[in-house]
Amino acid sequence: MKPYFPMFVNLEDKRILVVGAGTIATRRIKALMKFGASIRVVAPLFEHELERMEGLDLINRGFTPGDLEDVDIAVIATNNAPLNEEIARMCEVRGIIKNVSSDQTLCDFFFPATIMTDDIIVGICSGGNDPSVTKKARSDIEEYLKEKRR
């Protein structure tokens, strides 16, 4: 696996495109929204949960290459792996960093498991190799932080 630099990014002025609106896309959107991201979602169908979320720009249709105009970050999470790969290649040409749900080798970044308190944010990532290790580490760190606050 390539080494990934753990980096915390201010998303308030970033334009984020999410292609797809299923379970994985919804989970990614929820994570991004916690950090003030401006998110446009392109998909032919939307989960009801997404339709109820405020602050999203929902575009009800399939992806077109023009959707990548003025995008800083792309989250590609359709249920069509060849389409995901095609969009990822378009992002590479345009210099858009991307996360691709169907192929971690195409990802420029991963979504870490996060722990947020009033004064600390912790991100944990196994690079997609072993989610159970990430889950255990998150649980252990959460417990540690709870004990420190007592």
State the predicted function of each range.
Residues 1-45, 49-53, 58-61:
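Hydrophobic, well-ordered beta-alpha structural blocks that scaffold small-molecule cofactor pockets
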Residues 73-77, 84-109:
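ADP-ribose/adenylate-binding Rossmann-like module
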